[in-house]
Structures are given as C-alpha cells and as structure tokens.
Amino acid sequence: LAKIKDILIIVNKGQLEQYKKILPNGKKLGIKITYIEQETPKGLPDAFILGEKFIGKSNISLILGDNFFYGQFLSTKLLECINLKKGAKVLLHRVSKPEKYGVAKVKKNKITLIKEKPKKFFSDLAITGLYFFDNKVVKFAKQLKPSKRKELEITDLLNKYKKRNELTADYIGRGGAWLDTGS
C-alpha cells in the first residue's frame, strides 16, 4: 500500500461493528486501522474534520468507499500523495457520460473549473473518488458552509484550493481502471 500503514475508515452510524468484523484492526495486513463513526451524513469534507486528530500534520488521501480502483498506478499515486509539497490533487478519468459525475476542466495540469453533474458539456474528465490533500485540508473543511443539501460539499473544498492555484490534476494511466459503484 505504498508505505501507508495508518488507515482511517469513517462509517455511518450503526455500521461500525459490521466493518470491524470484516477488517478488525489491520494487524494481519501489517497496517493499523482506526474507525470513526459519523453520527449523521454531513458531506465528504466532514471526514477531514472528524479525522483531524488522525491527520495531524500529515498529507492525506481520501478514497471513497464506493469506488474501485485497479492497476499498478495506485501505489505510484499514493506515494505521490506522501510527497505532496502543498495543495490538493484530484485523480481524473475520461468518461462517456460526464453528466453523471463531478467533472473538471484542466489547463496545464491545473484544474480551472469543477462542476457536479453538469447539464451542459464542458469536459469529459470525471473526478474519481481518489483525492490527495496537504494538511491544510482540515482548516479549509472547517471554513465551509453547508450547501442547500445541508452538507459540506467536496467541490467547495476543492474550489478553496483552486482559488489558491493549488489544485492539480492527475490521471488514471494505461492499464488502470476505475469503477464508481455509487453512480
């Protein structure tokens, strides 16, 4: 797992014991798994607020639980997260139906526009469920205001980095695969 030995899994209220049965503590895998139970769904950025103590001064990778990644690229990308100097990086993948995903427009590896499920086409680069952040992510997540859905939105968090010109793009390379089981 690309030198990653500490993993935080955030679970919905009432699901903690089910997860612990499947992945008790990670000892057999040579990792340490920490669990936090989220009382109510408050959006993806809430994971950083809940995990503040776990994150500390480290960079962090967020992998959505309903996304499946396959290929050797994953270890390489996770290593890059460890070495991320500043900012955030989003893993993108070309899709045939961008209206089903969060989508990004990119210029010279910098993300210039992000929209969630756009009605009008502007890019076919879907934002996969793999994100990399420096340790400012907790501070930025705490600054967010809930959306109309009464949740903190990942696009708002990414836009904080974009405004600082610190949001970059990366791609699933040849031989890699991504499946969003939630879409």
Region spans (language model):
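Conserved N-terminal catalytic core of the sugar/cofactor nucleotidyltransferase
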Residues: 1-64, 68-76
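Conserved donor-nucleotide/metal-binding helix-loop-beta segment in metal-dependent transferases, i.e.
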Residues: 71-99
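A short acidic, often aromatic-flanked loop/helix-cap motif at beta-alpha or helix-coil junctions
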Residues: 41-44, 97-99, 120-121, 177-179
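Conserved hydrophobic/aromatic beta-strand scaffold that supports enzyme active sites
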Residues: 90-92, 103, 130-132
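Short, conserved catalytic or adaptor-binding loops enriched in Gly and charged residues
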Residues: 24-30, 105-106, 160-163
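Catalytic-core segments of class I nucleotidyltransferases/pyrophosphorylases
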Residues: 61, 75, 79-82, 110-182
